[in-house]
Amino acid sequence: MKLTLMRDNGGTTTMRTLDINIQIETMKHETKAQPDSNLRTSIRYASPDSKLDDVKKLAKVVPAATFRKIVNGIQMTGYNGIIQIEVNHLANRMEVNRVKQEAAELSHTFAAFMGSGGHSVKIWIRFTRPDKSLPQKREEAEIFQANAYRKAVSLYPVSYTHLRAHETKA
C-alpha cells in the first residue's frame, strides 16, 4: 500500500509517493531538523490568534490515495481504503498515550499515532468492499471514502469525547 506526502514550497506543491509502512516507520523517528518538536514548542508559547511558521514545514500525509501532478492539477493514481479519524484536544501526553493504546487494541485499527501538535491522536482504519476489492476511479473512491468514514466513526468508543472524523479526500 502506498500514500502521498504533499508539501507546499512557497506556492509550488511537491508530491511524493511512499510505501505506507515506510512512512509509519519514518514517523516513529523524528528527523534531525525536528519539525514536530519545534511545532509543539511553538504551540506551547503561541497566542491563540498567531500563525505558526513551523506548520508550513510539515508535509501533509494523504493516507487514502496516491496522486500525481497533471497540467490542470492533480490526478489520483491509486486508492488504498485508509480512513483517518482524529481524537483532538487531548490534555497531555498521558491522555494521548491512553487513546493510542485503546485504539491499538481494536482489531480494525491499522495504525494510531500522536498528531504533530502533541494533543491529538490520528487513527487509520483500512476498509475494503466485501470481496476485498477497492474502487479504482476517483469518483467511486470518493463515495466509498465518505461511506467508510461514517462507518469508521461508529467503530470507536463513545468515550472518545473529542472524536472528530476527518475525511481524507480520495
Per-region residue spans from a language model:
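DNA replication initiation on ssDNA origins
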Residues: 1-81
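Conserved alpha/beta core surface patches that mediate binding of polyanionic ligands
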Residues: 100-110
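Conserved small/polar residues in nucleotide/adenosyl-binding loops
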Residues: 161-170
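Short, surface-exposed ligand-recognition loops at beta-strand->loop->(often short) alpha-helix junctions
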Residues: 86-95
